[in-house]
Regions:
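Positions in alpha-helical segments
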Residues: 13, 41, 80-84, 166
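Acyl-group handling in specialized metabolite and lipid biosynthesis
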Residues: 169-171
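A short, structured surface patch at a secondary-structure boundary
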Residues: 73-133, 183
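Short, glycine-rich, amphipathic interfacial segments at transmembrane boundaries or analogous
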Residues: 41-78, 133-162
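A hydrophobic, helix-centered structural microdomain
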Residues: 1-63, 121, 173-234
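Intracellular leaflet-associated regions of eukaryotic membrane-associated proteins
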Residues: 116, 143-146, 205
Length: 234
């Protein structure tokens, strides 16, 4: 990452935190009052070159239910009413500007993964937003159609490779100007809905879900190697 890009990340993050400070304090208060537990959710994540750090979010789940499945879908009973609103508009991600200030993350980049995930040798700092984040903005809603016991397998086969491809293509040619464009796309997406890429990826993901459900309609049946290759070719 260039020194210019890193400095720009921190300047933008500091400005956003300063401007949004009153709103952040209000959100913290509402989260605390809406359900028992802290306002902030903290979790260890893997960053650039496997360097671990603590990621911050506004808590969107009940504390007693937060240790469930890693993949969250729409209608998940663990999500609070306030949490559902925060997640819908991505407001739960706002505390991560502090991670950018500390140098753990960038504004734009692949999302940070859990330390135990494979393939974590990222040459870039993870980001708050990115091409894959925007492309799969409706992921939770679409994944609700997949049976819970099959979610991990579906994600590994059908979603994870595509996200990695999109992020890698972007990061190979990323510049401060392209980052600013991604931030604008993120704001526009939150306020006005999905853009063309997100619509296209949602259509593709819906087709994958339909194909997966057809292949695995027998609960004891797992996709064959040939069927997995077909799914990956979508």
């Amino acid at each position: 990452m260039s020194r210019t890009r890193s400095c720009l990340d921190r300047v933008v993050a500091a400005t956003i935190l300063l401007v949004l400070l009153p709103a952040l304090l209000v959100i913290m208060l509402v989260v605390r009052l809406s359900s028992p537990g802290p306002a902030l959710f903290r979790q260890r994540r893997a960053g650039r070159n496997r360097d671990e750090f603590i990621l911050y979010k506004f808590r969107s789940m009940r504390c007693e239910d937060s240790a469930g499945p890693a993949i969250t879908v729409s209608g998940d009973c663990r999500i609070t009413g306030v949490g559902a609103f925060l997640r819908r508009y991505k407001l739960d991600e706002l505390p991560q500007f502090w991670n950018v200030m500390r140098g753990n993350m960038s504004l734009v980049g692949p999302r940070p993964k859990l330390p135990h995930h494979e393939g974590l040798d990222l040459p870039y700092r993870p980001g708050i937003t990115g091409v894959a984040t925007l492309a799969f903005r409706d992921e939770e809603k679409i994944l609700a159609a997949i049976p819970r016991v099959q979610l991990d397998a579906f994600y590994e086969i059908c979603i994870k490779p595509r996200k990695a491809q999109l992020d890698l293509e972007y990061m190979h040619s990323a510049t401060p100007m392209s980052d600013l464009k991604q931030l604008w796309r993120t704001c526009s997406s939150c306020l006005f809905g999905p853009d063309e890429l997100a619509v296209r990826e949602s259509e593709r993901l819906n087709l994958l879900v339909a194909a997966w459900l057809e292949i695995t309609r027998d609960a004891d049946e797992s996709p064959s190697e040939v069927e997995i290759d077909c799914l990956k070719s979508f």
